[in-house]
């Protein structure tokens, strides 16, 4: 897209290619510059001792570049699966790869529809990361929630 905009703006083919590559590098670097919530890394390290951990993401950040891929046994991205949450394809991939039943899986996420409702409808146990400490916006759904990453291991043990 950036390449085509440069061509339309009157830049030559080679210059447009170079500018598009440079723009993508800047975007990729920015997309993989992450500030973690307090306690999130320590919590994943602790959970990894007792559970198999995976990521189901619509995002395009590279966990290896970020430096946290070692915390997860499975990574399911929308780009790899050609689907986005709440599409059941995302959750079916988890079942297929892990060999677990849906009822054995806790899905932790911050989006009421894409994470909580979708995983619940698939038969998983959703846990809502409610960092803004607001009421759950969807009626008729009882959901386990947390706002402090340090509290997550105890919440999971209670389920």
Question: Which residue ranges define each predicted feature?
Answer:
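A metal-dependent, Asp-based hydrolase signature
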Residues: 1-24
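Alpha-helix C-capping/helix-to-loop hinge sites
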Residues: 5-9, 30, 78-79
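Asp-based, Mg2+/Mn2+-dependent phosphohydrolase catalytic module
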Residues: 14-17, 41, 45-46, 51-159
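Surface-exposed cleft-lining segments at the edges of enzyme active sites
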Residues: 25-34
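Active-site core of PLP-dependent enzymes with the aminotransferase class I/II
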Residues: 37-38
